[in-house]
Amino acid sequence: MGRMHAPGKGISSSALPYRRTPPSWLKTTSEEVVEQIVKLARKGLTPSQIGVTLRNSHGIPQVRFVTGNKILRILKSQGLGPSIPEDLWHLIKKAVAVRKHMETNRKDKDSKFRLILIESRIHRLARYYKTKQQIPPTFKYDSATASTLIA
């Protein structure tokens, strides 16, 4: 899929293995993986950070192949899912950082332009998540209250 505010085509990606079964060398059971996911989530890690930690530290290549469910589904079933989706959260965090930069650097025109692009991405993504019912229909991004959302 192409980029929204850049000319790049975005065709580079990693190739997932065709076999959907866990590797034969992996001795970890599904229950142990779920326990590790819950433990890492209680520490405050995001779903993508949990996936990276499991891959790098515990040698679990794909959680979905081992457990049959994705990390986010496991977290939601345990009641530990994030209140707003991770990609929207990171965009809001970036917008707050740029807005803080704009307070001290008022003449920075490029940052002002980039902030407009970031906020348009936030509005578009929020509209998508409202239709998918992953955020409440009353959710509205407001730059004044955005810092409380990511705190």
UniProtKB/Swiss-Prot annotation:
Single Gene Ontology MF annotation: small ribosomal subunit rRNA binding
Protein name: Small ribosomal subunit protein uS15
GO biological-process terms attached to the record: translation
Protein family (similarity comment): Belongs to the universal ribosomal protein uS15 family.
UniProt GO cellular component terms: cytosolic small ribosomal subunit; nucleolus
Top-level taxonomic group: Eukaryota
Record's keyword annotation contains Iron: no
Gene3D superfamilies cross-referenced by the UniProt entry: 4.10.860.130, S15/NS1, RNA-binding
PANTHER family, A to Z: RIBOSOMAL PROTEIN S15P/S13E, SMALL RIBOSOMAL SUBUNIT PROTEIN US15
PROSITE patterns in alphabetical order: RIBOSOMAL_S15 (PS00362)
InterPro entries named in the record: Ribosomal_uS15, Ribosomal_uS15_arc_euk, Ribosomal_uS15_N, uS15_NS1_RNA-bd_sf
SUPFAM superfamilies: S15/NS1 RNA-binding domain
